[in-house]
């Protein structure tokens, strides 16, 4: 049986952590930043865990992560 391919778009967006969790970047910080407050932009800086409802589909896209 051939190897499963990793979806490259998913591997660029998500990172797998040793504990089994998958991290993702925050949305809403690419453009139209002038109307967003400094506090809002600062809070969007970090990474966040993928929600449990999306975890199964993200793991299917990254079989070796």
UniProtKB/Swiss-Prot annotation:
Residues 1-15, 26-44 have a biased composition (Basic residues). Keywords: Ribonucleoprotein, Ribosomal protein. It comes from the Bacteria. Pfam families: Ribosomal_L35p. The keyword Ribosomal protein applies. One of its GO terms (biological process) is translation. Residues 1-65 are annotated as: Disordered. Transmembrane segments: none annotated. GO terms for molecular function: structural constituent of ribosome. The keyword Aminoacyl-tRNA synthetase does not apply. SUPFAM superfamilies: L35p-like. Belongs to the bacterial ribosomal protein bL35 family. This is Large ribosomal subunit protein bL35.
């Amino acid at each position: 049986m051939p190897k499963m391919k990793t979806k490259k778009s998913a591997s660029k967006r998500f990172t797998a952590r040793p504990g089994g969790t998958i991290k993702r970047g925050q949305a809403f910080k690419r453009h139209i930043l002038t109307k967003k407050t400094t506090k809002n932009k600062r809070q969007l800086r970090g990474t966040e865990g993928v929600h449990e409802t999306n975890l199964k589909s993200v793991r299917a896209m990254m079989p070796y992560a």
